[in-house]
């Protein structure tokens, strides 16, 4: 009987301890300030793209410069120099992560990107010729020829107006454009040599429904009576139109970043995309505005861009096994392996643990701003600093090779 009371007390103590769930110790490693209007919980996984602060400040109506961040295996977060245009749910280069949790990115080139049949985006040499696409998905340039000059009886050298190239269809169902010709040079009675206005080459369509532009040629030069040679006006490339009659602008794409096993975030060498391709095979021009629509009377009208007021993220990118995929819950960032996003002792942003790396400065206090950028406390700017072939990401300026950037949140989709 003398043991009954101590046993009851022990049972009550055990019950109360079981009901108490202590916070993870790293959740207290948070900045004192918070970002006004920032959200600390996001319903789906997302990635980040690097946006240069200097570029963003001068591009309200134009495309923003995007740099894909990557994550390598040790959890380090690093940034790429890939750029992509912004529109409603436009696509951007996703950040990649290597196995150690580092987020990294490689430099990109200015050459236009092509896509082969296995979906790889590769850099091609930039040429003046318009691109076509064959059955394996490669984008190739077509050749163009110049029309011969004609002369009538009074000595004038004239040419008829240039017309759009007719569309042909080969046996596998591909609809392709014939080579376009340049407007011939004409000469009137006072000896002036003049050129007709150039027209846009007709678009071609291959078997997957993709509408592509044929190469437009330069208008021939004209010469007025004082001997000056002048250039004729050229016309803009024709827009593409899908089966429902809508004339649309394309979303821009960029190479997705990867994550290696140590958690570092890296991006493979990528190129600036010349055009993007949506699921119906349509190649569209990169724009920041939404595509135009065509109503039944033939008028082309601009469509209004609709944005969910509760969702600050307006960019999407393809998701794959190496893409940095993060979750945000109660101000704590985790990657797909459950590692904690933190600012470590050297001020670098990377993923470790749990728990975070010993000596970590911040491991909580993350949010997404109303502008769609990742923030830590009340700070929404970070720094990409060159480290060999990649950029590491830091919350402070640590050297001459560092540049201020935003980390824009991007929704990840299966492509």
Swiss-Prot record:
Extract the GO molecular function terms from the UniProt entry.
structural constituent of cell wall
Keyword vocabulary terms for this entry: Cell wall, Cell wall biogenesis/degradation, Cleavage on pair of basic residues, Glycoprotein, Repeat, Secreted, Signal
Q: PTMs?
A: Covalently linked to beta-1,3-glucan of the inner cell wall layer via an alkali-sensitive ester linkage between the gamma-carboxyl group of glutamic acids, arising from specific glutamines within the PIR1/2/3 repeats, and hydroxyl groups of glucoses of beta-1,3-glucan chains.
Q: Does the keyword Transferase apply?
A: no
Q: List the GO cellular component terms.
A: extracellular region; fungal-type cell wall
Where are the annotated PIR1/2/3 repeats, by residue?
66-84, 92-109, 110-127, 128-145, 146-163, 164-181, 182-199, 200-217, 218-235, 236-253, 254-271, 272-288, 289-307
Q: Which residues form the signal peptide?
A: 1-18
Q: What is its main location?
A: secreted
Any single GO BP term: fungal-type cell wall organization
Question: Which residue numbers mark the site Cleavage?
Answer: 67-68
Site residues, Covalent attachment to cell wall glycan: 76, 102, 120, 138, 156, 174, 192, 210, 228, 246, 264, 282, 299
Pro-sequence positions in this chain?
19-67
- Localized where? Secreted, Cell wall
Q: What is known of its domains?
A: The PIR1/2/3 repeats are required for the covalent linkage to the cell wall. Their number varies among different strains of S.cerevisiae.
- What function does this protein fulfil? Component of the outer cell wall layer. Required for stability of the cell wall and for optimal growth. Required for resistance against several antifungal and cell wall-perturbing agents.
Can you tell me which family this protein belongs to?
Belongs to the PIR protein family.
- Provide the protein name: Cell wall mannoprotein PIR3
* Species this chain originates from: Saccharomyces cerevisiae (strain YJM789) (Baker's yeast)
């Amino acid at each position: 009987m003398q043991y009954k009371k101590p046993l009851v007390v022990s049972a009550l103590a055990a019950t109360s301890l079981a009901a108490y769930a202590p916070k993870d110790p790293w959740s207290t490693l948070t900045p004192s300030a918070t970002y006004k209007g920032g959200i600390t919980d996001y319903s789906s996984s997302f990635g980040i793209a690097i946006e240069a602060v200097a570029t963003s400040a001068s591009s309200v109506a134009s495309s923003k410069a995007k740099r894909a961040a990557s994550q390598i295996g040790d959890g380090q977060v690093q940034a790429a120099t890939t750029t992509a245009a912004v529109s409603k749910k436009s696509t951007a280069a996703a950040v990649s992560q290597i196995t150690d949790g580092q987020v990294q990115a490689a430099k990109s080139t200015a050459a236009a990107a092509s896509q082969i049949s296995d979906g790889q985006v590769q850099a091609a040499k930039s040429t003046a010729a318009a691109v076509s696409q064959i059955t394996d998905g490669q984008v190739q340039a077509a050749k163009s020829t110049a029309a011969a000059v004609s002369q009538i009886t009074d000595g004038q050298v004239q040419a008829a107006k240039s017309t759009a190239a007719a569309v042909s269809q080969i046996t596998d169902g591909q609809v392709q454009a014939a080579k376009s010709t340049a407007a011939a040079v004409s000469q009137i009675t006072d000896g002036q040599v003049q050129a007709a206005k150039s027209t846009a080459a007709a678009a071609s369509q291959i078997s997957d429904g993709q509408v592509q532009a044929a190469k437009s040629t330069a208008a021939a030069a004209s010469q007025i009576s004082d001997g000056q040679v002048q250039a004729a006006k050229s016309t803009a490339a024709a827009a593409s139109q899908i089966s429902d009659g809508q004339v649309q602008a394309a979303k821009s794409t960029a190479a997705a970043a990867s994550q290696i096993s140590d958690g570092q975030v890296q991006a493979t060498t990528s190129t600036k995309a010349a055009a993007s391709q949506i699921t119906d095979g349509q190649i569209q021009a990169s724009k920041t505005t939404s595509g135009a629509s065509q109503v039944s009377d033939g008028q082309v009208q601009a469509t209004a861009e609709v944005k969910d007021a509760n969702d600050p993220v307006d960019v999407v990118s393809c998701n794959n096994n190496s893409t940095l995929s993060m979750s945000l819950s109660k101000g704590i960032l985790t990657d797909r392996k459950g590692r904690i996003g933190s600012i470590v002792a050297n001020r670098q942003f990377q993923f470790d643990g749990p728990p975070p790396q010993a000596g970590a400065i911040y491991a909580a206090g993350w949010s997404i701003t109303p502008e769609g950028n990742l923030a830590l406390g009340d700070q929404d700017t970070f720094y990409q600093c060159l480290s060999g072939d990649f950029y590491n990401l830091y919350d402070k300026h640590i050297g001459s090779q560092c540049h201020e950037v935003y980390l824009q949140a991007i929704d990840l989709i299966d492509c």
